[in-house]
Amino acid sequence: MITQQIPHATTISALRTRVRSWREDRLSVGFVPTMGALHDGHVSLVRLAKAQCDRVVASVFVNPKQFAPGEDLDAYPRTLIDDAEKLTDAKCDLIYLPTPEAMYPDGYSAGVTLKGPALGLESAIRPHFFDGVATVVTKLFNQVRPDMAFFGEKDYQQLLVIRQLVKDLDFPINVLAGETGRDRDGLALSSRNAYLDSDQRTRAGQLNLILKAFAAALSGGASTSDATATALAAASDAFDAVDYVEARCAATLAELGDGPIDRPVRVLAAVRLGSTRLIDNMAANPPA
């Protein structure tokens, strides 16, 4: 467990006491929810929050509700001491460490389900996932009650799901997005990258190149169907398995027609190397 010298709360009451004191001083509150195993992408979100808000809360909670049986809940990396040091270095004002028992006590029965941007893509592969995300984020928003919440663009579908959640449930929260953090070869930073062996790590960098080419083809006037087929073929050659490679409307994640794009879109992919799943996305704009 982290030391008392690092400001943290493990109970809802302790969290609310600290946040209430900030509110009494008329300080704005930013919130960065995480599942731990923090990397530079998470740290950049905390720094973005610090630039926008007077005080920042970051949570570390591996949410069991968004893992299906057989997924990597037990294997998911847990590096709390290192996480606390990174958050402290980034000037996070409070680390919130709820327990599964506190979040989902005996008899817990509520859940949140969304449609709209939650349909397809990740949901087609992991149908439980966004229900778990929406439920835990709703609880965390009610517990922290921030003015702003910060999410990374790497999980683009999740970002749009959270924005829809805030809109539909009337949360008075501004959701801000941080750019995707990347390694030198363009691989999107992810806690699950730690699962990759050296050969897989080398191969993983191809995802960035495939999506860049996909976005460039669409922006250059290629038809959506042709550009998608080319990107899908490249991903199928590069990776052990492909869950999806698609172009969707950037604002809603609605499916597109077969022709050239006429609006901002997002190209999104999920692939596998061994048992490790990689996701990424990029923006593409219609030809000028």
Swiss-Prot record:
Its EC number is 6.3.2.1. Disulfide bonds: none annotated. Keywords: ATP-binding, Cytoplasm, Ligase, Nucleotide-binding, Pantothenate biosynthesis. It comes from the Bacteria. The keyword Cytoplasm applies. GO terms for biological process: pantothenate biosynthetic process. Catalyzes the condensation of pantoate with beta-alanine in an ATP-dependent reaction via a pantoyl-adenylate intermediate. This is Pantothenate synthetase. It comes from Maricaulis maris (strain MCS10) (Caulobacter maris).
